[in-house]
Amino acid sequence: MTERSPLRVGIGGPVGSGKTALTLNLCRALRNKYNMAVVTNDIYTKEDSNFLTRNEAMTPDRIVGVETGGCPHTAIREDASINLAAIDDLCEKFDGLELIIIESGGDNLAATFSPELSDLTLYVIDVAGGEKIPRKGGPGITKSDLLIINKTDLAPMVGANLDVMEQDAKRMRGEKPFLFSNMKTEDGLTQIIEFIEKQGLFKA
């Protein structure tokens, strides 16, 4: 019987939307449940992987930071080889790996993951970007497996109407799921985990 490949969950979204905070929360919630690892993408630094290591998301050997150079979307879409190589290394290092989170570098709304890199794609936008963000569309908003509208606590400060964002998200995504979250308070985290487990067939 062939060993099952790990589920690869891609987390994308613009700079500052809360991707790394989501990755950290997922690691803390799932690291004792699944054999898992993380690959982060940054243009010229390893800031996100260093942040996860400093905050003890997992043991440092399970967190790999890749420096993409140039446009971050190239490393998750047009030429995913640097990420695929990092995944291969992790699979060799940790036998029976079940889950790998791939966090993209911050990019625009047009960035998406290559199907060869990610089995399941979560796309994170934030309320601070304004209530118009969902209606702007783009592959991340319309085609991701789960759209996460983060930082709901900032809505009153930026004058964003969550009801408008909800209606626009429904219109842009059709039947595809989305949810509101606040990664600072872990609001919405349980639903995100349930989605990953159900779609990744960890749970019947």
UniProtKB/Swiss-Prot annotation:
UniProt: GTP binding residues: G13, P14, V15, G16, S17, G18, K19, T20
Key words, A-Z: Chaperone, Cytoplasm, GTP-binding, Nickel insertion, Nucleotide-binding
InterPro entries: CobW/HypB/UreG_nucleotide-bd, P-loop_NTPase, UreG
Annotated compartments: Cytoplasm
Cellular component GO terms held in the UniProt record: cytoplasm
Protein's GO biological process: urea catabolic process
Main location: cytoplasm
NCBIfam families recorded: ureG
Physiological role: Facilitates the functional incorporation of the urease nickel metallocenter. This process requires GTP hydrolysis, probably effectuated by UreG.
Protein name: Urease accessory protein UreG
The species this protein was found in: Acinetobacter baylyi (strain ATCC 33305 / BD413 / ADP1)
